[in-house]
């Protein structure tokens, strides 16, 4: 049997990722022996969801470690399947530019991130294949799995261009948002498998939950723009920014999307006022996100339903978590642990809100008036039924 080193680099990379993916797949296969197809797919989706959450946090660690260019090509590292094979190239790059982005440690961080991303992609491919074959038995459309597979391919392209375009801020931010969309797609599928409706009353509809999710996603995009432009420390102090309530800001340059990292749209260095504008936009819009989440949490708490109240507590807890980690980033000088906690909290908010919307959406059709003929006069009368929780 040929050794792994005997294969071409790209094939070695595929084989290596396949071997890594065997671990979760074997665990899933052994644990779900004899289970129904829906149970097996639900468990596989939950496993993929867990790894996707980890991938988002580790992606933040990769970016915060300045390891995004630890391997400056894609998908391998200097044409090799791992930094082991690229040891000589990495040493040469580090010797040529000791303070540059290429080191052995950064190369490993970047490649571990890629391995994990490829494993997630492979698990999604397996789930999509099974969903397509067992489409008649699924409680929801097989196109959800197909859409997730298509989206993870798009995410792979974002990952590629993040590296090949040298951390182009718009691409890096799109890569972050794409990860959040992928997380939401997996949460939706997991909830559809379980089909647990949650009836919302007191003027709260699924549309309202979706609106709050949109506000949170916009706030995450602004936070991603802060991180990718390294504008976290553009403001020191809180609640003021650099001892001013309204500092000088250049929103025009700060929110020019088509530009290189650290440069304006004209190719000059990005001025400090632009970085302040980027930071302040995230800080100010946080007030809108705060208001939306507090309102939703309060309305959920008033539902007089144990499940709704759990969602209220989860959202309130994540809101406190985000406020504490966000403030820690500013007042403590952007410590790694606070930055990672902030990224994890953002992903948690997306997951909880998506789950809430999915469960409310399942319940909503059952609350629509059902018209049945009157046994007396043949008139149509509306009857309203509530689904089982």
Locate the predicted segments by residue.
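N-terminal signal-anchor transmembrane alpha helix
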Residues: 44-66, 215-226
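Transmembrane alpha-helices
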Residues: 1-36
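Alpha-helical transmembrane segments
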Residues: 21-31, 128-129, 187-190, 296-298, ...
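Extracytosolic (periplasmic/ER-lumenal) interhelical loops and adjacent juxtamembrane/interface segments
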Residues: 64-110, 232-275
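Membrane-interface helix-loop-helix junctions at transmembrane boundaries of multi-pass membrane enzymes
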Residues: 129-146, 203, 297-315
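Membrane-interface loop-to-helix entry segments
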Residues: 8-17, 107-126, 170-184, 277-295, ...
């Amino acid at each position: 049997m040929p050794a792994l080193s005997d294969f071409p680099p790209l094939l070695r990379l595929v084989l290596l990722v396949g071997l890594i993916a065997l671990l979760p797949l074997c665990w899933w296969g052994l644990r779900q022996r004899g289970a129904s197809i829906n149970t097996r797919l639900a468990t596989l989706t939950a496993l993929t969801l867990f790894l996707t959450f980890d991938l988002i946090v580790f992606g933040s660690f990769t970016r915060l470690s300045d390891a995004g260019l630890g391997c400056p090509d894609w998908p391998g590292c200097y044409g090799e399947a791992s930094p082991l094979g690229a040891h000589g190239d990495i040493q040469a790059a580090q010797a040529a530019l000791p303070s540059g982005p290429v080191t052995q440690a950064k190369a490993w961080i970047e490649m571990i991130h890629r391995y994990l991303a490829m494993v997630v992609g492979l698990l999604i491919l397996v789930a999509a294949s099974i969903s397509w074959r067992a489409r008649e038995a699924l409680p929801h459309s097989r196109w959800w799995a197909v859409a997730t597979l298509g989206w993870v391919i798009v995410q792979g392209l974002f990952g590629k261009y993040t590296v090949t375009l040298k951390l182009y801020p718009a691409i890096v931010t799109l890569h972050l948002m794409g990860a959040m969309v992928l997380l939401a797609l997996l949460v939706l599928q997991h909830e559809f498998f379980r089909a647990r409706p949650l009836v919302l009353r007191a003027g709260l509809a699924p549309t309202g939950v979706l609106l709050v999710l949109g506000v949170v996603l916009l706030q995450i995009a602004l936070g991603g723009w802060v991180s990718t432009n390294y504008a976290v420390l553009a403001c020191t102090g809180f609640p003021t920014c650099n001892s001013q309530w309204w500092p000088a800001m250049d929103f025009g340059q700060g929110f020019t999307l088509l530009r290189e990292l650290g440069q304006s749209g004209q190719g000059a260095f990005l001025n400090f006022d632009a970085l302040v504008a980027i930071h302040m936009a995230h800080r100010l819009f946080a007030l809108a996100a705060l208001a939306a989440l507090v309102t939703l949490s309060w309305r959920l708490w008033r539902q007089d339903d144990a499940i709704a109240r759990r969602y209220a507590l989860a959202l309130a807890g994540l809101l406190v978590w985000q406020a504490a980690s966000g403030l820690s980033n500013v007042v403590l000088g952007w410590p790694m642990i606070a930055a990672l906690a902030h990224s994890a909290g953002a992903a948690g908010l997306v997951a909880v809100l998506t789950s809430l919307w999915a469960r409310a959406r399942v319940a909503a059709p059952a609350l629509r008036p059902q018209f049945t003929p009157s046994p007396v006069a043949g008139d149509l009368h509306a009857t309203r039924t509530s689904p089982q929780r």
